A protein has these predicted regions:
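Alpha-helical membrane-protein topology signature
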Residues: 1-176
Length: 176
């Protein structure tokens, strides 16, 4: 393992830290903003690893977080959700590199739909049951140790947030 490999993993670990902190934000708006920064780190990390589908897919996650934290009505609309999901499918077609390419795209479509419900419960459930498990498999396939840790930490963070805020208190965030 080279210094370059460790540097690439370090960029991913910064994304992991930011993503963990995102679920400790009570406001969905703040959660999406912190995730925006995390996704930027992961985009660079995955592209440097040569994981093109995951890297491009994370660019779309960055766009999604920007849209969901925006004040613009259209960016938080079902149309925007549909456009982002369609772009994920285009990414899959253009970057196909084997069956594992399906994993991040499916995960991110689920997370996009979950995010656009604006329900803290659905956001966390989608993350715990669909998004993280699929990303763990992809990260194993492409050699992203930071990604594997990120998803494990994300699972823990989502569970901690449910315990911390209480399931009943995780409802739609009216401040969006």
């Amino acid at each position: 393992m080279t210094i370059e490999f460790f540097a690439i993993q370090l960029i991913g670990f910064l994304g992991t830290t930011l993503f963990f902190l995102s679920y400790q934000c009570r406001s969905n708006k703040t959660l999406f903003r912190v995730q925006f920064l995390s996704y930027l780190c992961y985009t660079v990390h995955l592209l440097l690893l040569g994981a093109t589908t995951g890297g491009i897919s994370y660019i779309l996650n960055t766009v999604r977080s920007f849209c969901l934290s925006s004040e613009k009505h259209f960016l938080k609309s079902r149309w925007a959700c549909g456009i982002i999901c369609a772009l994920q499918l285009v990414t899959l077609m253009l970057t196909w590199d084997g069956w594992w390419s399906i994993l991040p795209v499916t995960a991110n479509i689920a997370a996009t739909i979950g995010g656009y419900t604006f329900s803290a419960r659905k956001i966390r459930l989608t993350g715990m049951l669909i998004n993280s498990p699929l990303w763990i498999l992809y990260d194993i396939a492409v050699g992203s140790y930071a990604g594997i840790l990120d998803e494990m930490v994300s699972e823990a963070s989502m569970l901690i947030s449910i315990i911390r805020f209480g399931w009943k208190n995780l409802t739609c965030d009216e401040n969006l």
